């Protein structure tokens, strides 16, 4: 990463499956990059960005082998995590769906331009759509775990309390 930043002026690094890396490894990489200076290296390392897919799954799930670089475990590091909550709310579908076209998202016609594949009742589709609107609202607020919003059904919840596939939707302490 140092080589790419110094010699090719790459200013951001995205990690696929970042959750399969130890959080300490990612923090060391961030620290090493931050040591680069304009005078010495031709790049301001403090301005370089690291982010990735902070998914919690597979053989390392739930910190089985090490503390993972996952959503909610990178607070205060300056390392970002991809927002799958916002993606799924807008695009539709989810990571465990057999056919991602069935559950339409906020931006793909859910409740306004139905594709005919979703066989749920209108009430269930409406509730899902409105929940996706709540996920979009939270995403626009930086997916902050402490952000408070009023959900479609009138409840006041924090981002951490808003459901996303059985876990809290809000995972960030800063946007």
Task: Identify the residue ranges that each predicted region occupies.
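Active-site neighborhood of glycoside hydrolase catalytic domains
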Residues: 1-60
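Conserved alpha/beta catalytic core and glycan-binding cleft of carbohydrate-active enzymes
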Residues: 30-32, 45-175
């Amino acid at each position: 990463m140092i080589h790419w930043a110094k010699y090719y002026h790459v200013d951001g690094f995205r990690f696929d499956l970042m959750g399969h890396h130890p959080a300490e490894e990612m923090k060391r990489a961030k620290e090493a990059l931050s040591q680069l200076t304009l005078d010495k290296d031709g790049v301001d390392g403090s301005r370089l960005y690291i982010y990735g897919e902070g998914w919690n799954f597979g053989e390392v799930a739930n910190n089985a082998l090490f503390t993972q670089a996952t959503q909610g475990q990178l607070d205060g590091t300056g390392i970002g995590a991809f927002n799958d909550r916002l993606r799924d709310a807008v695009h539709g579908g989810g990571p465990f769906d057999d056919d991602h076209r069935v559950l339409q998202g906020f931006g793909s016609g859910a409740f306004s331009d139905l594709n005919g594949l979703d066989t749920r009742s209108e009430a269930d589709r409406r509730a899902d759509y409105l929940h996706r609107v709540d996920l979009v609202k939270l995403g626009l607020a930086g997916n902050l775990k402490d952000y408070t919003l009023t959900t479609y059904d009138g409840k006041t919840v924090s981002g951490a309390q808003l459901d996303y596939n059985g876990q809290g939707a809000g995972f960030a302490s800063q946007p």
